[in-house]
Amino acid sequence: MKIKKKYCGHVIIVGKANVGKSTLLNNIIGKKISIVSRKKNTTQSNITGIKTEDNYQSIYIDTPGVVFDKNNNQMKHHKNNFYQTTQIATLIIFIIDRIDWTIHDEIILNEIKKTKIPILIIINKIDKISNKIILLPFINFLKKKIDFIEILPISAKKISNLILLKNIIKSYLPENCHIYPECYVTTNSDFFTVSEIIREQLILFLGDELPSIIKVEIESFKKKEKIALYIKAIIWVKNVRQKSIVIGHNGEKIKKISMISRNNIEKKFYIKTHLVLWVKDKN
């Protein structure tokens, strides 16, 4: 019996904040493993997604959106770590927002070019481009920048060109043993998953009222056999003012955040959940 060759590699997803990296990752994996919102820098840590199809295993790393200093357009290294993640990369997916090429895209491209790793550029949100004729001149403009392995216009939200994208990625995976079992879709811990579910609701309910640096700490996570899940979490904010914003008038806002978070946790883990949230300030 002939043994099938196996292929496996790491694919790093990079780009400015809010260009659709997490949406793309979720659609490639086929499950929501990274929270999504219109707020910039929703993703605060590397999110790993795993897609195994037959003898191919792609390990995707969704990096936080690259942040720039407003004064000098320099990358803020302490908030972005794709320099480290590219060390293990087989392929880099560089996502840009429609045909909006900025100095920040240029800076990111110059950095990832230094890695000598193959780069696939994705022009995302093409569903928002009414006149598609302008795409071709823009693609020609990009081709002059570097010899990309492919320039692919897509709509991550509407999953256009997803099969083509997956096939391109597979063609660059090296022959390797699979690192994770076939059933794995992420390396995120249960603690991390729960904290992200809560943080997503905070972002949705609070919008721009609070900075994206808000932190959710899981204080306890206990499962009573297969009957129920008991979770206590602390929402850390900067000061008393922010604390009152999160809690809301008569506690209405935090009640809604808690209720929807609990429902989403139950859907994720298929178990009845008891969730207690505390809001604390660091002062």
Curated annotation (Swiss-Prot):
Signal peptide: none annotated. GTP binds at residues 15-22, 62-66, 124-127. Keywords: Cell membrane, Cytoplasm, GTP-binding, Membrane, Nucleotide-binding, Ribosome biogenesis, RNA-binding, rRNA-binding. Gene3D superfamilies: 3.30.300.20, P-loop containing nucleotide triphosphate hydrolases. It is found in: Cytoplasm; Cell membrane. Residues 41-45 are annotated as: G2. GO terms for biological process: ribosomal small subunit assembly. This is GTPase Era. It comes from Buchnera aphidicola subsp. Acyrthosiphon pisum (strain Tuc7). The lineage of its organism: Bacteria, Pseudomonadati, Pseudomonadota, Gammaproteobacteria, Enterobacterales.
